[in-house]
Amino acid sequence: MASENQKLSSVALTPVEATDYAENTATYKANKRPFLSFMSGISAGACIALAFVFYTTTQTASAGAPWGLTKLVGGLVFSLGVIMVVILGSELFTSSTLTLVARVGGRITTTQMIRNWIVVYLGNFVGGLFIAAVIWFSGQTMAANGQWGLTILATAQHKIHHTWFEAFNLGILCNIMVCVAVWMSYSGKTVTDKAFIMIMPIGLFVASGFEHCVANMFMIPMGIITAHFSTPEFWQQIGVDPMKYADLDLYHFIVKNLIPVTLGNIVGGAICIGVFQRYLTKTH
């Protein structure tokens, strides 16, 4: 068994080594200066937002395509966002929930962990809103005769109509897959290893419609902007009454989606993957 682990370790980290790597990474993140964490969070938020732009393009005017196939394509292209975050070394709130492994290991304090979560969360929000603003002013919502903007509206509205408990559980499922992807990337020793291993777990959560709080920091504000600031020409092109999307507002965004999804993401990442995986590898 030892020789098998040694052979594996030459091409990839063993589960125990990956857990050590996760703990070291979590410790580094928690000890980073808050301003750097915030700026790194902006970068990650922008990466995820751009990935959702890519996703939206693949879903636009796709009514004639098989539903599952369309979602699969959307999930696969969205994985680019998490790949960019990991390769660039940016900080994403959902994967930063894994800092709980360093807290459980006694290497950081609860204050350090919570501070990192808050700073990165705010940075992610700024990054997502920045891309939303740039996309809006670029006129991208008018692409494909306004169908691109209609996809944004439909996707955003769907997200705010989960029940609170549904959104919470969709958040758990999402961050189980995100943190599985990131944790598996810790085992890779090359950029190709790390990128390739994350594609399918991320594709799974997106194609299945699980909820990611940072992605929603772009998608739902983008929907709100499109619903309330689009020109009459936009609505004429898509042939839809603007009142259909009047419920896209801050209340529905924050209360009905962002809060329960964020809490679910914490449970899915910090506990279901971080603490559980550490227990599996560190206690034997």
Swiss-Prot record:
Ranges facing Cytoplasmic side: 1-34, 94-116, 185-194, 274-284
Record field: catalytic activity: formate(in) = formate(out)
Hydrolase as UniProt keyword: no
Site description Important for formate translocation, residues in chain: T94, H212
Membrane topology: Multi-pass membrane protein
GO biological process, one term: formate transport
Residue spans crossing the bilayer: 35-55, 73-93, 117-137, 164-184, 195-215, 253-273
Molecular function in Gene Ontology: formate transmembrane transporter activity
Periplasmic side, ranges: 56-72, 138-163, 216-252
GO cellular component, one term: plasma membrane
UniProt keyword list: Cell inner membrane, Cell membrane, Membrane, Transmembrane, Transmembrane helix, Transport
Protein localization: Cell inner membrane
Superkingdom as given in the UniProt entry: Bacteria
InterPro entries: Aquaporin-like, For/NO2_transpt, For/NO2_transpt_CS, Formate_transptr_FocA
Keyword Transcription set for record: no
Family to which this protein belongs: Belongs to the FNT transporter (TC 1.A.16) family.
Subunit and interaction comment: Homopentamer.
Role: Involved in the bidirectional transport of formate during mixed-acid fermentation. Functions to maintain relatively constant intracellular formate levels during growth, using different mechanisms for efflux and uptake of the anion.
NCBIfam families, per database record: fnt, formate_focA
Name of the protein described by the UniProt record: Formate channel FocA
Gene that encodes it: focA
